Structures are given as structure tokens and as C-alpha cells.
């Protein structure tokens, strides 16, 4: 049985949650942090994933990749790439399929990985983290992604999960997952015919800003409107601060950090810390030791100066709010509460701008960092066949109208708008077409002029085959089940031909008919399912052979990572054993080894230490094991003698203690008997005592 796993796939950090019988828990990683850096790095032998990638980022700057979700499913020639490339320190390249990849040094070679592979590496890492921490089997996941993700990017996220060995039961909009978290755990929501509670959610994370208007009743949620700014996030504030100090340091210290990626990254990391400090203080010092050219750079920044630096960004705060309200058909006065989530909403000036946009105070009843992950875990639990959860219905919203188009064979029309903009999903529509043979269908966004710039209007294509025309007919009716699934992906779920058959049915008798009346039978024509047709989908998902190849590559790299980790553990165990045994030979083991044994073992330890730092500094796991066992063959004999003597001492001490306890018990019993005897004497009558004397 798989434990439901929810992943809030953040741009800077990701949060992991699992659903269990007692509730939903956040999973801590190997260093007990409640979030994990969304980052992968590459070394001479193995990969560095999550925390280890972050730790080595400064020293491994060109081989460390962050901002993973921003390049997933993105074309190299897309205008967004120019904005994204500013935040990467590794080399980004154009792949054969036109997508973005990164070129790094891995295992001593120049290697290129696709964005899907990079995301799969990280997802595999967090899967292992959840399995280790929960000691549970993890196969199903609900991944929370940005609302602005296209169909192609959602397929890419699902493919990355499959490469990592997971079944993506749902790709959910991150802000919708936060809404689910709100709706599930709120106990005071309206019921029945009561007016729904209207809540605006503001999520400003590391790289983007989303506003969503939702309506809540007990056990249900409906998204009314959503808008976003893809390039408004914490990293933009960090970059503004970094650029400010880049100019200052160029004048003050005659250094240009823009020409040194490592220096620029160090300043940007310090800028992020400064931003957080200024959330609680009006001014703060800023310093970076040995930033470049042996220069220790220092300065300071006030909150007022920061607000001036990001003033152009703050002017964009109201736009997503206005658009989301317009899509919902509401005004700011209709909003009951404004919930803020995401780390960047902690910036005071940003909070003030949001509050002013709605004209009301902000609410922070949700955990700003963990609400999305918990909502995703609950959604995953809904799909679990073994875990019971409280009933909760939620519907998201189509941002753009989607039409289906087909070959024009019999009908006058060759397209139909199936899923209008602002309609809810998941949803299913049935349509019937008259076909003269096999045919193809396409799904496209209806109005190209409504789409964001450079968004491809094509969504998917399907080939429908197996259409058989009855003898004497020129066409056959075909019914198609069109669906926008819970992940927002457009599919044709089923296709089958129809036929008319004549059946006999009894005509119901009137109520006043005699008891012996015989019902009349008439023939009626019914349309029934005839042949199930074959559907071949052409979507953005990876082909099976390509997917299997990438799964195999990921498994190989995972095995290599595991081998390197195990080898390092064996090396550390050997080093620790050498130092520990050497110290104990002159202390607690001294009386349990002959002079010859001590001399021999000390010589072996010295040679083993020399080997460890020379020929054995970088070798295979088996050699560390062999060297350890060679030393342990003698060391364990001496240790055995020591432990035997210690056990003998314990036995003697135990026997002595038992004897002392027995003696104490005997003394106590004797004292008790004496006391009882004295008490008996005191109780004897005086007359009886005299009579006994006579």
C-alpha cells in the first residue's frame, strides 16, 4: 500500500507532506529541515541532490542547477528563456527537440541533461526522503505546480514523476491545493443554502505571484477566478538588491561581480538574507568576505532604500488582483477574507500593498510555507483506495476556451468549443459525429488572441481508427467522450460507434385495465454501442521507449549515487576504527593483549592509516571492507577478551549486590521478628504473667 504523498514543488525550496490515518504530516529531510532546496548538482562520481547540492553550490557553481520548475517544458527560443537565463549559473543549451537542457561536468565528462531529467532527479530525491523518514512505500504523488503551467509543462511534470518511479495521480494548481488545505481544515464554513465564503488567496513565492478567488462551503470549494505574474517573486527582490550592491562595489572597491558568477551568486545569497532581516528591522548591515580579488565587501541597506529599489515591482501588485476579481465577476468588497501564503508575502511593504489592493486586513490562518504541500497530500489521499478521508469536492477553472476540431467528412461543422473559458474542471462532454471512415481530432485553444504571448494554440491530436461502415450505408455515428481530467489535461477517454436496433417492448397497461388484460407489445428503435474504436493519442507526453530509456538512466545514476555513499560510509568506518582501536590499545585493551599482539596490531594500524590517505584515499568499497576486516580479525579478538572480563566483573558485581541485598533482607526480617516478639510481650496481661510465676 502506498502512502499518499503531496509535493509542493517550489522554485527555491520544496515541501513534502504525507497523508496517514491520523492526519497529514510534513516530512523533514536528512538534516531535519521542513523544506528541501529544489536543486541538483553534479560531481566527479555522483550527483548532489537537495541539501547537498545547496551546500556545494558555491564551490560547484557551474555544475549546480536550480530554478528547476521554470525551465520544465519550456522552449529554448521562448521569450521567457531570456528572463530565466539570468538566474542560472550552469550552461543552458538548446536540445534537439528545441527544449532547454543544461551542460555540466559529471563523472569527468561533459554531459547534457534535459529539464525533464533534472526535475526527475530532484523528485526521485524527495521520494527517497519520504520513504526513509516515514518507512513507508511511496508510489503515488500529487504534484502542485504553478497555475500558469501550460498543458505541455503539466505533461512534463508528470513525465518527470514517472522517471522518478512515481505515479502522478494528479497535477494540481498550487494555489488550488492551498485552497483545499483551507477548506478541509476550516470548521466554520457556511453550509446548505447559506452564502458561500469568498476568500482571496495571494501566493508570492520565490519566482511568481498568483491571486485566486475561491468560494467555500462545508465540504466544497469552487475556484472563481485566477490571475498571475510569472516574474514577480522573492528572487526578483534578491536580484534588485544584488544589482544595487554590484553598482556600489564597482565604484567603492573597483570590482565587478557581474563578471564573476561565483561572486555574483554569493552576493545574491547574502541579499536574500538581508531581505529577510529587513522584514523585521528598519536597517541592516551587509557584508561578504572575500567576495572576489581578496576584497571583503561591506555596506548597509535600509528598508526605505529597499522599497525604492523594488518600487517598479510594487506597482504591479494590483494587476493580478484586478484580473482575478474580474474573472470571478466580483469586486473587492465581495471578498470576505484575504489569505496570504508564500515566503515573499512576509515583506512588510508588499503586505501593505496587498492589503491596500483589497481594502481590508490580511489573514494568515494558513501555514504560509506548508499549506500547499498539505493540500496536495490530501488530494493524493482522495485517490487512495485504502485511505478514508472526509468528503471534499473541489473544482478548478479553465483559463482559456478549448475547442475540438475534426476531419470534415459528413457534418457541415468541423469544430466545436467544448470547454469554455471560466468553466470548471474536471469535466466531461459527450459528442456524436457521423463518420465515413477513420478520422483524426485535434484540441486547440479557441481564441488565439486571448492567449499569453508565444503560447502554442495546439494542445493534442488523436487518431480514431477501427470505424466500420455498415453495408449499404455511407457513414456511421460515432460517440466520443471528451474530458478535461483532474490534472487539467485534455483527453479523449472513449470512442465507439453506434447502431440502431429494433427491440420489442411492452406498453404499460392503464391503471384501470382488467386483471386478465394482456400488455400490448410494440417495436421501438434504440441506439446502442456497437464497436469500441482505437484511440492513438499524440500529446506532449514522452513516448514509451523514450520514457523507459530515461527511467533506466535515472536508475543507473541512483545506483551510482548509492554506491558512492556506501563507499564513503565504509571509508569513514575504517578511519574511525583505526583511531578508536589505536587509542584503546593503550587504555582499556592494554591488559588484554600481549606485547607481540600490540606491536603487530599497531604496525597494521599505521600501515592501514598510511594506505587510507594514499592509495586508499579514493578506491572501491570492497577494499575498505577488506582492510576493515583485516584489522578486525585481530582487534575483535582483543575486544572479545575485554568484553568477557567486563562481563565477569558485571557478574561479580551482580552477585555481590545480590548477596548484599539478601543480607539486608535477612537483617530486615530478623528485625521484624524481634519487633513482633516485643509487641507480643507488651500485649500479655499482668495477672496472667503473675500466675505463670506461681
Curated annotation (Swiss-Prot):
One Pfam family, short name: HSP70
Region (Disordered): 671-694
Keywords: ATP-binding, Chaperone, Cytoplasm, Nucleotide-binding, Stress response
Subcellular locations according to the entry: Cytoplasm
Main location (coarse class): cytoplasm
GO cellular component entries: cytosol; fungal biofilm matrix; nucleus
Any one Gene Ontology BP term: proteasome-mediated ubiquitin-dependent protein catabolic process
Basic and acidic residues compositional bias, start-end: 675-684
One function term, GO molecular function aspect: adenyl-nucleotide exchange factor activity
Coiled-coil spans in chain: none
SUPFAM superfamilies found in the cross-reference section: Actin-like ATPase domain, Heat shock protein 70kD (HSP70), C-terminal subdomain, Heat shock protein 70kD (HSP70), peptide-binding domain
Family of this protein: Belongs to the heat shock protein 70 family.
Protein name: Heat shock protein homolog SSE1
Organism: Candida glabrata (strain ATCC 2001 / BCRC 20586 / JCM 3761 / NBRC 0622 / NRRL Y-65 / CBS 138)
Amino acid at each position: 500500500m502506498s502512502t499518499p504523498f503531496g509535493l509542493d514543488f517550489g522554485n527555491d525550496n520544496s515541501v513534502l507532506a504525507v497523508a496517514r490515518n491520523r492526519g497529514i504530516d510534513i516530512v523533514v529531510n536528512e538534516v531535519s529541515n521542513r523544506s528541501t532546496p529544489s536543486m541538483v548538482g553534479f560531481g566527479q562520481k555522483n550527483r548532489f541532490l537537495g541539501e547537498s547540492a545547496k551546500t556545494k553550490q558555491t564551490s560547484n557553481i557551474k555544475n549546480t542547477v536550480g530554478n528547476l520548475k521554470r525551465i520544465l517544458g519550456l522552449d529554448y527560443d521562448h521569450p521567457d528563456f531570456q528572463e530565466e537565463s539570468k538566474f542560472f549559473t550552469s550552461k543552458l543549451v538548446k536540445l534537439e527537440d528545441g527544449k532547454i537542457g543544461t551542460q555540466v561536468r559529471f563523472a569527468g565528462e561533459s554531459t547534457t541533461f534535459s529539464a525533464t531529467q533534472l526535475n526527475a532527479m530532484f523528485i526521485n530525491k524527495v521520494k527517497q526522503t519520504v520513504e526513509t523518514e516515514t518507512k513507508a512505500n511511496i508510489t503515488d504523488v500529487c504534484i502542485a505546480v504553478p497555475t500558469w503551467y501550460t498543458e505541455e509543462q503539466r505533461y512534463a511534470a508528470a513525465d518527470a514523476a514517472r522517471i522518478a518511479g512515481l505515479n502522478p495521480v494528479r497535477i494540481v494548481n498550487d494555489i488550488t491545493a492551498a485552497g483545499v488545505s483551507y477548506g478541509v481544515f476550516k470548521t466554520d464554513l457556511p453550509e446548505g443554502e447559506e452564502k458561500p465564503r469568498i476568500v482571496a488567496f495571494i501566493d508570492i513565492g520565490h519566482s511568481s505571484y498568483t491571486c485566486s478567488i475561491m468560494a467555500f462551503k462545508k465540504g466544497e470549494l469552487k475556484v472563481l477566478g485566477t490571475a498571475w505574474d510569472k516574474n514577480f517573486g522573492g528572487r526578483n527582490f534578491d536580484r534588485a538588491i544584488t544589482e544595487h550592491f554590484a553598482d556600489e562595489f564597482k565604484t567603492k572597491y573597483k570590482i565587478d561581480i557581474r563578471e564573476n558568477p561565483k561572486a555574483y551568486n554569493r552576493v545574491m545569497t547574502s541579499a536574500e538574507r538581508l531581505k529577510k532581516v529587513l522584514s523585521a528591522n528598519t536597517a541592516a548591515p551587509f557584508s561578504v568576505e572575500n567576495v572576489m580579488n581578496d576584497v571583503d565587501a561591506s555596506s548597509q541597506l535600509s528598508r526605505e532604500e529597499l522599497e525604492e529599489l523594488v518600487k517598479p515591482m510594487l506597482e504591479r501588485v494590483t494587476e493580478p488582483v484586478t484580473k482575478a476579481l474580474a474573472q470571478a465577476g466580483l469586486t473587492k468588497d465581495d471578498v470576505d477574507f484575504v489569505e496570504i501564503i508564500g515566503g515573499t508575502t512576509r515583506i512588510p511593504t508588499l503586505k501593505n500593498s496587498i492589503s491596500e489592493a483589497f481594502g481590508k486586513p490580511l489573514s494568515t490562518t494558513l501555514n504560509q510555507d506548508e499549506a500547499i504541500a498539505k493540500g496536495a497530500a490530501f488530494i493524493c489521499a482522495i485517490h487512495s483506495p485504502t485511505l478514508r478521508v472526509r468528503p471534499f469536492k473541489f473544482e478548478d477553472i479553465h483559463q482559456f476556451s478549448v475547442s475540438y476540431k475534426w476531419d470534415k467528412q459528413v457534418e457541415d461543422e468541423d469544430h466545436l468549443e467544448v470547454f469554455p473559458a471560466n468553466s470548471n474542471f474536471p469535466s466531461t462532454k459527450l459528442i456524436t459525429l457521423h463518420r465515413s471512415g477513420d478520422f483524426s481530432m485535434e484540441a486547440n485553444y479557441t481564441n488565439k488572441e486571448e492567449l499569453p504571448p508565444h503560447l502554442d494554440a495546439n494542445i493534442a491530436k488523436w487518431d480514431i481508427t477501427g470505424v466500420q461502415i455498415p453495408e449499404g450505408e455511407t457513414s456511421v455515428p460515432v460517440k466520443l467522450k471528451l474530458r478535461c481530467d483532474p490534472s487539467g489535461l485534455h483527453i479523449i477517454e472513449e470512442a465507439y460507434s453506434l447502431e440502431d436496433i429494433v427491440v420489442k417492448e411492452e406498453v404499460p397497461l392503464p391503471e384501470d385495465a382488467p386483471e386478465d388484460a394482456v400488455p400490448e407489445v410494440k417495436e421501438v428503435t434504440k441506439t446502442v454501442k456497437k464497436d469500441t474504436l482505437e484511440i492513438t493519442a499524440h500529446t506532449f507526453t514522452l513516448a514509451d521507449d523514450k520514457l523507459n530509456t530515461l527511467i533506466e538512466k535515472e536508475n543507473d545514476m541512483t545506483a551510482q549515487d548509492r554506491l558512492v555513499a556506501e563507499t564513503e560510509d565504509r571509508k569513514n568506518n575504517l578511519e574511525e576504527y583505526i583511531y578508536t582501536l589505536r587509542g584503546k590499545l593503550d587504555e582499556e585493551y592494554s591488559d588484554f593483549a600481549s606485547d607481540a599482539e600490540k606491536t603487530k596490531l599497531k604496525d597494521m594500524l599505521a600501515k592501514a592509516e598510511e594506505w587510507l590517505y594514499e592509495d586508499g584515499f579514493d578506491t572501491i568499497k570492497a577494499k575498505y571492507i577488506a582492510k576493515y576486516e583485516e584489522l578486525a580479525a585481530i582487534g575483535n579478538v582483543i575486544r572479545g577478551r575485554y568484553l568477557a572480563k567486563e562481563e565477569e566483573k558485571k557478574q561479580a558485581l551482580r552477585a555481590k549486590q545480590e548477596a548484599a541485598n539478601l543480607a539486608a533482607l535477612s537483617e530486615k526480617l530478623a528485625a521484624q521478628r524481634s519487633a513482633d516478639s516485643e509487641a507480643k510481650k507488651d500485649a500479655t496481661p499482668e495477672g496472667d504473667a503473675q500466675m505463670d510465676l506461681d
